């Protein structure tokens, strides 16, 4: 049962990245007046906001694919879920750090909660060796 819940969690965490995809493509606003990823400290000045939004969109889809694939790996009882989820968590955290606007206001709009979840996933999987299962 814990593997099923863990797999569902990873799939849902991946799907939340698609909300940030929609935000970055301007398909909808997650919150009124939310402009993420415009003003990203690592890309906006260099590439402009339009290209930054495209890069953020692609990155969010890749992170989503990683988490969904990891969840599917758990459901299918495949050992490869572990490196896939670790890679997705690291990639996702790096994405949100790079697309952060550099300000300390509205951190939750900048992906701070996703970063905290990714850190928790990394601690659980790499340090605590959770979930401890044999396939």
What are these regions, as identified by a protein language model?
Residues 1-135:
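Membrane-interface extramembranous regions
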């Amino acid at each position: 049962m814990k593997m099923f819940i863990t797999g569902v969690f990873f799939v849902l965490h991946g799907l939340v990245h698609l909300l940030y995809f929609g935000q970055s493509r301007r398909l909808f606003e997650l919150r009124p007046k939310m402009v993420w990823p415009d003003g990203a400290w690592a890309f906006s000045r260099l590439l402009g906001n339009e290209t930054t939004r495209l890069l953020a969109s692609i990155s969010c889809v890749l992170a989503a694919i990683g988490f969904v694939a990891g969840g599917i790996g758990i459901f299918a009882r495949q050992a490869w879920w572990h490196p896939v989820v670790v890679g997705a968590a690291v990639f996702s955290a790096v994405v949100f750090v790079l697309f952060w606007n550099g300000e300390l206001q509205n951190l939750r709009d900048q992906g701070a909660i996703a970063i905290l979840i990714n850190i928790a996933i990394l601690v659980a999987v790499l340090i605590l060796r959770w979930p401890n299962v044999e396939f």
